[in-house]
Amino acid sequence: MINDRETLDLVPLSLPPGAPAVAWQVSDALVPYPEAIAAMEARAAAIAAGQAPELVWLLEHPPLYTSGTSGKDGDLLIPRFPLYASGRGGQVTYHGPGQRVAYVMLDLKRRRPDVRAYVAALEQWIIGTLAHFNVRGERREDRVGVWVARPDKGAGFEDKIAAIGVRLRRWVSFHGIAINVEPDLTHFSAIVPCGVTDPRFGVTSLVDLGLPVTLQDVDVALRQAFEQVFGPTADAGLPADDAALLR
């Protein structure tokens, strides 16, 4: 069943014309998870205090697992890589090279203080990004994230191509989304991804779907689709201390 979040009005998630653009930062090197968390928390606090602009930060992590606030002990089947308690919503997932993570730090008090509408907007952003590659991403009522139908695997089979996990502090968001471009999908076999145990529902990536897509291709699509949902962006001009953290 299609998720009723699809019916939410997304227009209020963008700011009025003339509002400051969202800073857009891309890290080329792998970013350790603890470093990313520290940078996000510092930036979110600065945004809440009116001392920094909103930010979208694109990066890759080294191979690791993270557990959200709904994670269960049994979700990690094989401790192949480090497991971090993330504080975001959701359960256990994998991050690693070939997966584009986008950490999103927006002031929802100014945009729309509505968590449900924000998650719907993130889903729409992902769906718009996938559409650039002629991939139909879909919401599901009982499963978070964005899914693609896999009729090649059988009737009713679907694979998750993008994950969502968010946290808010003083109505500033952090954490965000992860789109599988070309990660090693075998690493998902060491966990119960996002708590989904039904064998009809797996994990896929753009390359797994047969598309010769690079991270750089996805970055372009992400930025265009983001602006359609949330409004204008601008290349981040970070202070020296922030640049050290954000690569």
UniProtKB/Swiss-Prot annotation:
Record key words, sorted: Acyltransferase, Cytoplasm, Transferase
Compartments (UniProt record): Cytoplasm
EC number: 2.3.1.181
Function recorded in the entry: Catalyzes the transfer of endogenously produced octanoic acid from octanoyl-acyl-carrier-protein onto the lipoyl domains of lipoate-dependent enzymes. Lipoyl-ACP can also act as a substrate although octanoyl-ACP is likely to be the physiological substrate.
Family: Belongs to the LipB family.
Gene3D superfamilies: Bira Bifunctional Protein, Domain 2
Enzyme class: transferase
Name of this protein: Octanoyltransferase
